[in-house]
């Protein structure tokens, strides 16, 4: 891109657990400017929904990583989307969660919020998991009562007139997954049509 005088930037979706400030600085030098990190509510709920493989909690490590970046990086050219997947058992604690966000992140415009309901996207096998799914009425209630949290320039772009156009249609958009697979779409991961090769195998 530099040789051809083309602008380049990248974004990553990460659980944030290993996103230390030192790792962030290395990524920033590589023009990774957009990050999506999931925080599923306060510690008690997040640590029940998003645990390590060995069952260890993750909330404190992720929050401390985010705060280290927030407090030490002065660049305005980065964006953090804090995604929250609301399950039924979170709906009674939204106010408390908002107070937490206000305390640590709402004073920094680089941090945006993206709220979704937990749902079945085709991989759920047990009824126990289905019991935490929210309904469309729950999402409607969430948006109507917390509009000021939900609406920001990120969600406006996502749900605006152009937001419904799949970014896989863009000629200059590619996905590189954790295994080095090169794809266009971040959702249709099993389709061979969505697979262009592998770094180090088909591409240097």
Which role fits each region the language model picked out?
Residues 20, 45, 201-204:
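Short, electropositive, low-hydrophobicity segments enriched in small/polar residues
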Residues 1-41:
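Conserved SAM/AdoMet-binding glycine-rich loop
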Residues 188-204:
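Membrane-interface junctions of multi-pass transporters
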Residues 17-19, 86, 118, 199:
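Hydrophobic pocket-lining residues within nucleotide cofactor-binding pockets
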Residues 16, 119-121, 188, 202:
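Short, solvent-exposed coil/turn elements at secondary-structure transition points
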Residues 40, 44-179:
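Radical SAM enzyme [4Fe-4S]-AdoMet core and its adjacent flexible, acidic
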């Amino acid at each position: 891109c530099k040789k051809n005088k083309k602008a380049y930037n990248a974004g990553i979706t990460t659980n944030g657990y290993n996103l230390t400030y030192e790792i962030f600085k290395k990524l920033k030098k590589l023009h990774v400017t957009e990050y999506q990190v999931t925080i599923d509510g306060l510690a008690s709920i997040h640590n029940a929904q998003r645990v390590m493989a060995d069952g260890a909690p993750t909330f404190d490590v992720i929050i401390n990583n985010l705060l280290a970046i927030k407090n030490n990086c002065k660049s305005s050219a980065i964006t953090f989307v804090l995604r929250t997947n609301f399950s039924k058992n979170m709906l009674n604690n939204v106010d408390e969660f908002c107070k937490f966000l206000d305390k640590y992140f709402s004073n920094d415009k680089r941090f945006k919020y993206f709220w979704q309901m937990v749902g079945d996207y085709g991989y759920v096998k047990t009824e126990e998991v289905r019991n935490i799914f929210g309904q469309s009425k729950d999402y409607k209630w969430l948006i109507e009562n917390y509009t000021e949290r939900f609406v920001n320039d990120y969600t406006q772009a996502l749900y605006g007139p152009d937001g419904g156009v799949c970014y896989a249609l863009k000629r200059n958009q590619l996905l590189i997954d954790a295994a080095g697979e090169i794809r266009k779409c971040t959702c249709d991961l099993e389709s061979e049509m969505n697979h262009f090769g592998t770094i180090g195998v088909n591409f240097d």
